[in-house]
UniProtKB/Swiss-Prot annotation:
Gene Ontology terms for molecular function: ATP binding; structural constituent of cytoskeleton
Family: Belongs to the actin family. Plant ARP8 subfamily.
UniProt source species: Arabidopsis thaliana
Gene Ontology cellular component list: cytoplasm; nucleolus; nucleus
GO biological process: actin filament-based process
Annotated protein name in UniProt: Actin-related protein 8
Residues holding ATP: 256-259
Origin superkingdom: Eukaryota
Keyword list, A-Z: ATP-binding, Cytoplasm, Nucleotide-binding, Nucleus
Record gene name: ARP8
Subcellular compartments: Nucleus, Nucleolus; Cytoplasm
Length: 471
């Protein structure tokens, strides 16, 4: 009866047109071995690869049922190769699932788990991921906030934090309470029904005792507000670290072009290395928008609001690989803005992003982006934290203005020219993997882990106990 159902499932799945070969990624999976006492009956004559291919055409629940019939089928049905295939067929990208389950599974401090070590059963991982409760992810910064369910492909809501709530990086209880209550209302959820994953804003950057106390105060205020709202468990992770996870890395340098400032953070094994040095540039996305506004006014281009200018920045602006050469080109382009009509920009398109590399164009005395990243890399190299210097040679960009086309290529070229070859060799600059939602997607990786909430979350009881011990 089971085999009849198996072949019915095989027939239905084979007619769906799925290309099984395309799902077999370059991953080493130990071969399945059957003991001499095990038997698959009439299937004993089939090669193991064929048996696995047959099971791949079945639904996961049918594969589990088949594994209950005898030890031999259990050996085939529980193999990692089969369940890796099922995970590859899920909505989440397989590369992200594999990174999360091997690099983030242990919680913090991170411990890499090899797929070859025997510690990982992808059958159990598949089962556990299906049972992970849905979480609410809130990625809030000084400029904008994104929020939504962990099971969704992208955030379901956004808000202008600075306009609606003021400075949420200042740990004022009433302001944070209004911030979280508004999000829960818009999502139409009760705070007590699911865990919350929240990104910690990038602020108080130094390694001083004062900065540490300020960061601790903000984190404590966030926990107090959420637990007073009866949230069962909270996971709070640094915004830059989440962006790094979204790029499937646990070590590297994150460049966050924030609303008001640009921060360059070295991160090793998921920890911000403040003792090495966090670089801060005193302007951010707001300055880029303001610079474009000034250029438009100089050219008598009228607009209704700063939101219009921001829209034009997002849709038309880019970073030139060679600024001087770009000046002699025809770069005119037009775009329609809803409710305002068509706008045409020319040199403003690349002059806006150029102030990242030449702040003096905007009348600012500040470090350029490549100078700040180079300085951070110099500090990482001098610190000698690991025997391998490759950990800081991956640069991940994040933030809305970091999505400007051409920025990653230009920064990579500038770093190659600015740094000695001993450091510049092997440098790679990665654009925001998920655009403006990069940190949100890093949180999504954590919230969909098979062991979540597990080691990543703190419960209300644990927080209260820890607070009593501190005081």
């Amino acid at each position: 009866m089971i085999l009849k159902k198996v072949w019915g499932s095989v027939w239905n799945r084979s007619n769906s047109g799925k290309d099984l070969v395309n799902h077999q990624r370059a991953i080493d999976v130990p071969p399945l071995l059957l003991s001499s006492s095990s038997s698959l009956g009439a299937f004993d004559q089939l090669p193991m690869d064929i048996l696995v291919q047959i099971l791949m055409m079945m639904e996961p629940k049918d594969a589990v049922k088949l594994g209950l019939t005898c030890k031999a089928w259990k050996c085939v049905a529980s193999g990692n190769r089969l369940w890796i295939f099922y995970l590859q067929c899920s909505q989440e990208p397989w590369d992200s699932i594999f990174f999360a389950e091997t690099s983030l599974r242990s919680g913090y401090p991170l411990r890499m788990i090899s797929s070859q070590s025997g510690e990982l059963s992808f059958m159990h991982i598949y089962s556990q991921r299906a049972q992970v409760p849905g979480s609410i992810i809130i990625d809030g910064g000084s400029g904008y906030c994104k929020f939504g369910w962990s099971k969704y492909a992208s955030p379901s809501g956004r808000s202008a934090t600075f306009l609606e709530f003021g400075n949420i990086e200042s740990p004022i209880y009433a302001r944070l309470q209004q911030f979280f209550a508004t999000i829960f209302t818009r999502m139409q959820v009760k705070p007590s029904m699911q865990p919350i994953v929240v990104s910690l804003p990038l602020c108080h950057f130094d390694d001083t005792e004062s900065a540490k106390a300020s960061r601790r105060q903000l984190k404590t205020a966030i926990f107090n507000v959420l637990f007073d709202m009866n949230v069962p468990a909270v996971c709070a992770v640094n915004q830059a670290v989440l962006a790094l996870y979204a790029a499937r890395r646990t070590s590297g340098i994150v460049v966050n072009i924030g609303f008001q400032v640009i921060t360059i953070l070295p991160i090793l094994h998921g920890k911000v290395m403040r003792q090495v040095g966090v670089e801060v540039i005193g302007f951010g996305a707001l300055k880029l928008t303001g610079f474009l506004k000034e250029k438009m006014q100089e050219n008598n281009i009228s607009f209704q609001s700063l939101y219009t200018v921001r829209t034009l920045k997002e849709k038309l602006c880019y970073v030139a690989l060679d600024y001087k050469a770009e000046l002699s080109k025809d770069t005119q382009a037009s775009v329609e803005v809803s409710g305002e009509g068509w706008f045409t920009l020319s040199k403003e398109r690349f002059q806006t992003g150029e102030i990242l590399f030449q702040p003096r164009l905007a009348g600012m005395r500040a470090m350029s982006l490549h100078q700040a990243v180079s300085l951070c890399m110099d500090h990482c190299d001098a610190a000698g934290l690991t025997g391998d210097d490759s950990w800081f040679k991956t640069v991940v960009l994040t933030g809305g203005s970091a999505c400007l086309p051409g920025l990653s290529e230009r920064l990579e070229r500038e770093l190659q020219d600015h740094l000695p070859s001993s450091i510049s060799n092997g440098i790679r600059v990665i654009p925001p993997p998920y655009g403006v939602d990069t940190s949100w997607h890093g949180a999504k990786l954590i919230s969909n882990l098979s062991i979540f909430p597990g080691p990543w979350c703190i419960t209300r009881k644990q927080f209260r106990r820890k607070s009593r011990l501190m005081w």
